[in-house]
Amino acid sequence: MEDPESLGFEHMGLDHRLLQAVTDLGWSRPTLIQEKAIPLALEGKDLLARARTGSGKTAAYAIPMLQLLLHRKATGPVVEQAVRALVLVPTKELARQAQSMIQQLAAYCARDIRVANVSAAEDSASQRAVLMEKPDVVVGTPSRILNHLQQDNLKLRDSMELLVVDEADLLFSFGFEEELKSLLCHLPRIYQAFLMSATFNEDVQALKELVLHNPVTLKLQESQLPGPDQLQQFQVVCETEEDKFLLLYALLKLSLIRGKSLLFVNTLERSYRLRLFLEQFSIPACVLNGELPLRSRCHIISQFNQGFYDCVIATDAEVLGPPVKGKHRGKGPKRDKASDPEAGVARGIDFHHVCAVLNFDLPPTPEAYIHRAGRTARANNPGIVLTFVLPTEQSQLGKIEELLSGDSGAPVLLPYQFHMEEIEGFRYRCRDAMRSVTKQAIREARLKEIKEELLHSEKLKTYFEDNPRDLQLLRHDLPLHPAVVKPHLGNVPDYLVPPALRGLVHPHKKRKKPLASKKAKKAKTQNPLRSFKHRGEKCRPTAAPS
């Protein structure tokens, strides 16, 4: 039930164009962080806001930022076009996401407000051309912004009025401390600033001293995750590693988990092991690999959000592992791209309409659990989190329970009522599938994905034109078969379905595939060997003898 005293968007004094964009996004009322932060920001106050993942923090700073920029252009003196707002985020994916949200909110004032994202690893010359047009809002990671400031592609000292630091609790742990301190030297002495964070830690306090001036602190009295009426959280104890694979197979193949799902594991190798295991049973899934280029990772997320596939396997090891301070940050060509913090995607990325989060591997820290679970039950949508636990992981599970239960002490991770003995008939199938997914198969699968990226890389297109033999070597290499797929494993005989589920699940029913493109149909009809149909010679009627 809506609080009658809560403040709606229409009562915040927002520009009618922003209100129209908010309506188009389907937001009937502001979230708690938006309701509290937007009026204070419009009063010109600095903000230090903490709110849980998925609570609408991006819009909480984007709406007042756009309102202040529009108001200045409408009522202030005519001045030269310049960069007025800077948004700092820890990763390239978050920069792309922030830019997208700001552009959606500015849809009806796109002529007045221009937004540029300079976080992508593009040529500096092309980004320089964008910055020379002096967009109103610039979004990027601290390292990329500092690089453009040092090259004089971007000048903020005389024009910037607003600074936003999103996911502030991650910036220092990602090794951006030195970049931030250097970047602040290029900013004016007076500006309004917003710090948005999911947690308050020592890094956030240090940022507060560097960036904010007499801020208002919003520490909302809300749980870090939605309540049980919106988010259901379960844990299931698996006696062995084999039991985890068996249970996951049953949940997905028998459609006990429906809708779009995120599967979290702790290492990239485990991601591919799980994907190859699921492929044995014709269960499609893709791996969100931090080693792949930004464009490829964003394309995976985009297709997942559009419903092209229902299952993504991800890891937060790159993002939520041990903190990496700036002075120890790796430099040079030997730096591992997979551990590059700007390549991480587990925290803060907006996966749309995720119905379930499956922690196939127990999160390494309680905070990691919070951020994984925050990918579902966003806004007012329901969600479920299911965590697989081995007997040796009970102590770590207890730490997660302690963080979730808080002062009440009431259990939050409820036991998932599942009788493993009912799916024992599937064990031999899972055992065979696990046996076929060897380390060599995993290595070949990763190699195959990298080769495909090379073939589709825009940057390498010119190289392959000059060196066609290298392209032929890639294309004519032996076909990779990461695991021996047995077609019959894609079907589930009725006698193997647990008695309690017979008639309720339809394991034979496959997801409807999109119709073949017109181009493919045309190619088939133009191929005489594929389109020719021999019907035999028809007997001609003969004239009756006279």
From Swiss-Prot:
UniProt biased composition (Basic residues): 505-524
Binding site for ATP: 51-58
Region feature Disordered, mapped onto this chain: 323-342, 504-546
GO cellular component: nucleolus
Phosphothreonine modified-residue sites: 141
Motif extent (Q motif): 7-35
Modified residues (Phosphoserine): 126, 531
Sequence ranges assigned to domain Helicase C-terminal in this UniProt record: 230-424
Superkingdom, taxonomy of origin: Eukaryota
Keyword terms, alphabetized: ATP-binding, Helicase, Hydrolase, Nucleotide-binding, Nucleus, Phosphoprotein, Ribosome biogenesis, RNA-binding, rRNA processing
Cross-referenced CDD domains: DEADc_DDX56, SF2_C_DEAD
PROSITE patterns reported in the protein's UniProt record: HELICASE_ATP_BIND_1, HELICASE_CTER, Q_MOTIF
Residues in Helicase ATP-binding domain copies: 38-218
Cellular localization per UniProt: Nucleus, Nucleolus
Record field: catalytic activity: ATP + H2O = ADP + phosphate + H(+)
Function (record text): Nucleolar RNA helicase that plays a role in various biological processes including innate immunity, ribosome biogenesis or nucleolus organization. Plays an essential role in maintaining nucleolar integrity in planarian stem cells. Maintains embryonic stem cells proliferation by conventional regulation of ribosome assembly and interaction with OCT4 and POU5F1 complex. Regulates antiviral innate immunity by inhibiting the virus-triggered signaling nuclear translocation of IRF3. Mechanistically, acts by disrupting the interaction between IRF3 and importin IPO5.
Protein name: Probable ATP-dependent RNA helicase DDX56
Species assigned in the record: Bos taurus (Bovine)
